């Protein structure tokens, strides 16, 4: 279950890449505490919708027919589920020099704030969460499993850079890189 939480947040970042916004996703995982943060450099959640997009069903941007056809996530449910299943959940959206952020505890809104973002902040979304240990008993993210999943995202999205705790994962050739990296053959032949 903890990997599904991670997947749902990353899927939103990948959706931005697929639609032509942002080519980099920064992921930090504390393998001791289970805390995860994901920062994409896409368009950022609309500032007036930050709380709704992570806490109320049927309020995400993926309910637009134009967006839906490109979405890989749960179409408006994913981050809400992550929020509900986390002890702590933080979301911050950056858009055109402004930001909006919200903090939750076990799905309940604790605080929210809007303002001007630092000059260096590019558009995009930041999400930080810790899976609830009362729901996910004795959980622990396994680094090798996380890195393998991130490589799969890279293979399926050529040109996307995933930075996982400082490890850059990128595939320029997509599925060809997957075949090359995973093939057990002595020589990989090029197609005619």
Model regions and ranges:
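GHKL (Bergerat-fold) ATPase N-terminal catalytic module, capturing the glycine-rich phosphate-binding loop
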Residues: 1-131, 136-137
